């Protein structure tokens, strides 16, 4: 078992602080409008100190967007593994995505606005993970309704994401639980009515 040294923990903590600062600022202003010095100041370090942890501002964006795409895919795979029943699997996917959308509205904003600012290799990595995530939903929907066509299931999955990912635009910061109930009910209704 490997344990982090005190210095290793500090470095990991600083890296997390820099990512959190970058996430907040990029969500507020957009990637292009944020300077490396702004991120450093928000994290309590000088701009150049960031280079000890990341090669540049672009690397922060890569870590944010590739990171969330990878986490979403892994989470959905885990939901399926834990829920062999098709109905429970779909409910689990809805709850999992709701957890993400309510906890990470800044990442949704960044994804919507700044994906094009990623280097092409990172964009491909994000898109590949997103396609696999969509296919998990398509599979879950078709397992629940074997008569459902693949294209229709894909449209339904994307519609569900549109509803669930509306949180940065529709949710007041003080009402995540109210929003959860409404978004869950609307998503279930939308997926059930097709």
Model-derived features: positions:
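Amphipathic alpha-helical segments that line or abut small-molecule/effector binding pockets
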Residues: 66, 87-102, 154, 158, ...
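N-terminal intrinsically disordered/low-complexity leader segments
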Residues: 1-13, 20
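Amphipathic alpha-helical segments used for helix-helix packing
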Residues: 102-121, 169
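Amphipathic alpha-helical packing segments from all-alpha helical-bundle domains
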Residues: 70-73, 120-145, 154-158, 181
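Amphipathic alpha-helical linker/stalk segments
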Residues: 66-91
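Generic hydrophobic, amphipathic alpha-helix propensity
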Residues: 14-22, 39, 64-68, 72, ...
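Amphipathic C-terminal alpha-helical segment
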Residues: 100-103, 139, 150, 157-177, ...
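Helix-turn-helix
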Residues: 17, 21-59
């Amino acid at each position: 078992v490997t344990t982090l040294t005190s210095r290793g923990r500090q470095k990991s903590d600083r890296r997390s602080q820099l990512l959190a600062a970058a996430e907040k600022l990029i969500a507020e202003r957009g990637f292009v409008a944020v300077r490396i010095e702004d991120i450093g100041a928000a994290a309590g370090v000088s701009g150049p100190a960031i280079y000890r942890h990341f090669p540049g501002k672009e690397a922060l964006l890569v870590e944010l967007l590739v990171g969330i795409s990878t986490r979403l895919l892994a989470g959905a795979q885990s939901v399926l593994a834990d829920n062999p029943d098709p109905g429970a699997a779909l409910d689990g996917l809805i709850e999992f995505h709701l957890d993400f959308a309510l906890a990470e509205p800044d990442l949704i904003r960044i994804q919507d606005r700044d994906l094009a600012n990623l280097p092409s290799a990172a964009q491909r990595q994000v898109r590949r993970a997103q396609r696999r995530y969509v296919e998990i939903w398509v599979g879950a929907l078709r397992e629940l309704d074997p008569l459902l066509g693949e294209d229709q299931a894909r449209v339904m999955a994307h519609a569900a994401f549109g509803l669930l990912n509306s949180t940065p635009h529709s949710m007041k910061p003080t009402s995540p639980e109210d929003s959860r109930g409404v978004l869950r009910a609307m998503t279930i209704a939308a997926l059930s009515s097709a």
